[in-house]
Amino acid sequence: MNWQQRSLAAIIGVVVAIGSLAAQSTGTVSGTVTLTSASREPVGTAAYGRRGVAPKPAAVGPETRKVVVFLEGVKPSAPPAPMRAKITQRGEQFLPAVTAVTVGSIVDFPNEDPFFHNVFSLSRVRTFDLGRYPSGESRERSFPRAGIVKVYCDIHSQMSALIMVLEHPWFTIPAESGTFTLPPAPPGEYTLVAWHERIGEQRQRIRVTAGGTTRAAFTLPVLESQP
């Protein structure tokens, strides 16, 4: 082994050691989000008539992709790295409907429909108007402040999307199955939040331990029960 090979091996060893140390000094937060809807079958026997509805898992598919799971009130020691996200205009919809990014991130808005769109927001966190632009064109905006930004199309009133801008990187959007895992978090006690624009939010107190895994489960009612 020559000196170059030895130097490369030493560098790889340092990188592996740093990665191992980082993993040992942070913890994993993972879990599930379950959305429930109202069953139309009555609860109880026929002798007492209909007394309400029983919640059951909702086959809502992508609705879980409209949930944001995050640690609440966390102040990182350094500003989080900005991200690059994309919200596509396709089929007269914004895809995805919900996006979460860190402060300072840039979001691209490509138009994949064969007609014009005009993306805008009147949210105080970030007000903008991208103007009308045709198919195949993309425009972007940065998001320097934390908060919730609601996005619309000035041409197609049914189109809407939501961007949650956070001051730290410890957040995620669950998979369609409802499973989620946050980026590795420093040890400590936190409030974990599962948020949905229409449903509201649920909170859980959790403890993150170095090198450990903290699990949480949320159940959110996606539909109101019908009398």
Listing of model-derived features with the role each one plays in the protein:
Residues M1-I11:
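Bacterial N-terminal signal peptides that target proteins for export
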Residues Q24-P227:
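Extracytoplasmic copper-binding redox domains, predominantly the cupredoxin/blue-copper superfamily
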